[in-house]
Regions:
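Acidic, glycine-rich catalytic loops of TOPRIM or P-loop NTPase phosphate-binding modules used
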Residues: 110
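Residue-level detection of the helix-turn-helix DNA-binding "recognition helix"
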Residues: 107
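Basic nucleic-acid-binding alpha-helical/helix-turn surface characteristic of O6-alkylguanine DNA
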Residues: 1-97
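Short Lys/Arg-enriched helix C-cap and helix-to-coil transition segments
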Residues: 113-120
Length: 120
């Protein structure tokens, strides 16, 4: 069963979807809250602290759903510190992929903000 929480932020509504107590998707939409777990409550707190400037990342339990290349790239994105960026080329070189392939993998990231594809 998938549960969800919607949070109003200064950039609009953000909804996190969870399955098996792990976040599987974050979208910029508003949905009706359902079965709010401790992990979703933590996401709400982390998100609010992130936008308040108290935290530099959002740390919650996530379930990465993808192939091995996607998961490697997404884990690499998670390592990019707040205020820093990397290029598609830098990540591609590390995993012997083309920059376009890395770009495509970034576009398939469903866990926005937690996996910071906006830093690439």
């Amino acid at each position: 069963m998938i549960s969800q929480i919607s949070i109003k932020t200064k950039v609009g509504w953000i909804t996190a979807f969870e399955q098996k107590n792990k976040i599987i998707k974050v979208k910029f939409i508003k949905k009706k809250n359902s079965l709010i777990s401790n992990n979703l409550k933590k996401f709400r707190s982390e998100l609010n602290n992130f936008f308040a400037g108290k935290h530099k990342s959002i740390n919650c339990r996530v379930l990465l759903r993808g192939n091995s290349k996607q998961i490697k790239v997404w884990k690499e994105l998670k390592k990019i510190k707040f205020g820093k960026t990397k290029t598609y080329g830098e990540i591609a070189k590390k995993y012997k992929l083309s920059p376009r392939h890395v770009g495509k993998i970034c576009s398939q990231n469903e866990i926005l903000l937690i996996i910071p594809c906006h830093r690439v």
